[in-house]
Every structure is written in structure tokens, then in C-alpha cells.
A protein has these predicted regions:
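A generic alpha-helix preference that emphasizes hydrophobic side chains
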Residues: 20-22, 81, 139
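Flexible, polar/low-complexity N-terminal or interdomain linker segments that lie immediately upstream
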Residues: 2-9, 14-66, 75, 153
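Positively charged, proline/Ser/Thr-rich regional signature most characteristic
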Residues: 40-113, 119
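Short, surface-exposed amphipathic charged segments that create phosphate/polyanion-binding patches used
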Residues: 101-103, 147-151
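Thiolate-centered catalytic microenvironments shared by cysteine-dependent enzyme domains
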Residues: 5, 24-43, 116-148
């Protein structure tokens, strides 16, 4: 008696068709998805840039950076760091089309301990942006140093 190879395959295929989706879902309860893979115990630690470094880049008209302001649009329109684009803080940001993955993104906020900046930077890193920095002490330090600002309009 000869064994039919399809007879062995049938149970596997049937299992695949009728098994609950959770059987195949990747369990990532103790980690974070990074580039589609679960990394257990992943903790994002941001790189920081000082306001002095950022001012130098702005003064030298650096083409290698994009400044990202996490404020709500009306606040950003009122006043922001020169050249900053607006990417409002959100718990789930989508990959913004206007941000280049080739440039260094410098994220800042007007918040205590740079919390919103760190969260947006973390989300951007999870979306595949590899060159992301947080402006140390953010907007308030920028103003304290009396560096230039601009408004939309």
C-alpha cells in the first residue's frame, strides 16, 4: 500500500483554515513591535541635541536636519523654532510623508521633561526613522536662551 502525500497535507491545511487567528498572531505582551518584529523588553532611549547645537545647525543652514514641533497647530502657527514643521503630539502618529528618513529629525515640545518629544521620537523610531533626536529642555530652554523664533504667516 502506497501512502498518498496529499493525505498528510490535508490535516495541516484544514488546521490553517479553521484555527483561530490568535493562533498565528505574534504575542508581544512584554515588548514592542520594532520594524514588524516583537522586541521583548524594548525600551526607547532617545538621543539628545542641545539648543546650542541646533542653533549652530540653523545658523549654518544645515540641509541635514528637520526640526519637528509637537505642539497643536494653533500654537505652532503662533510661534516656533525657525524652519520647524508641525507634527502634533498623538498617542499613535502615522508616518508623516513630509519627513525624510535620510535626515536627522530634531523633535521638541513645550512640556515638562521633554515628555511629548520623547514619545514622538519613540514613535518615529518605531516607524523606521533612524536619525531622531530630542531637543534637550525643548522650547522653554530655546526661549530662555533668547534664540530666534518665527510664526506662520
Amino acid at each position: 500500500m502506497r501512502l498518498n502525500p496529499y493525505a498528510l497535507l490535508a490535516p495541516v491545511l484544514l488546521f490553517g483554515l479553521f484555527a483561530p487567528a490568535s493562533t498565528f498572531a505574534q504575542d508581544c505582551k512584554n515588548g514592542t513591535f520594532v520594524d514588524g518584529e516583537c522586541v521583548e523588553g524594548y525600551v526607547y532611549v532617545p538621543d539628545f541635541m542641545s539648543p546650542q547645537e541646533l542653533k549652530k545647525d540653523i545658523d549654518e543652514h544645515s540641509k541635514d536636519i528637520v526640526i519637528v514641533d509637537t505642539a497643536a497647530p494653533p500654537i505652532w502657527e503662533e510661534e516656533h523654532i525657525p524652519g520647524a514643521v508641525n507634527l502634533p503630539y498623538s498617542k499613535n502618529i502615522a508616518a508623516p510623508a513630509q519627513l525624510s528618513r535620510e535626515k536627522t529629525l530634531v523633535v521638541y515640545c513645550a512640556c515638562k521633561d521633554d515628555d511629548d518629544s520623547k514619545e514622538v521620537a519613540r514613535q518615529l523610531s518605531l516607524l523606521g526613522y533612524r536619525k531622531v533626536k530630542v531637543l534637550k529642555d525643548g522650547w522653554f530652554k530655546w526661549l530662555e536662551l533668547k534664540y530666534k523664533t518665527e510664526s506662520k504667516g
